[in-house]
């Protein structure tokens, strides 16, 4: 193979996966197994619940303590989690260039006419599939 490869991967990054650093570990695995160069990688963070709607409890706050800057204390005394920021920070820590990380910045909870939202629909949702294609 030449120096430029076309490897694709995807990972689900809810709060558990995010605090367990799934984005960072996915990049590390791709580098280890395929010899990828993170500086040449592209990443996309797709639609998901935004920090505007993602109120979390103390269990999540404690589990994500390493990423304290991803939690915002709201006037009601509750914390909201920014999964987009948490995963961006992990991708950057793995060596991806900031300009190579695209975030859809689309909240599924605020856009229920377009997406299912487990949180907004109290678990009574349809399902979404994600595929990665080469053009």
What are the residue ranges of the model-derived segments?
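Active-site microenvironment for binding and transforming phosphate-containing groups
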Residues: 3, 7-135
């Amino acid at each position: 193979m030449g120096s430029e490869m076309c490897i694709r991967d995807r990972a689900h990054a809810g709060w558990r996966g995010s605090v367990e650093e799934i984005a960072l570990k996915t990049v590390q695995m791709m580098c280890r197994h395929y010899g990828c160069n993170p500086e040449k990688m592209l990443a996309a963070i797709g639609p998901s619940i935004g920090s505007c709607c993602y109120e979390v409890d103390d269990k999540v706050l404690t589990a994500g303590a390493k990423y304290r800057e991803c939690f915002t204390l709201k006037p009601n005394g509750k914390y909201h989690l920014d999964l987009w920021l948490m995963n961006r920070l992990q991708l950057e820590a793995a060596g991806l260039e900031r300009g190579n990380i695209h975030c859809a910045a689309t909240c599924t909870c605020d856009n229920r006419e377009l997406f299912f939202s487990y949180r907004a629909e109290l678990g009574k949702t349809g399902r979404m599939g994600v595929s990665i294609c080469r053009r």
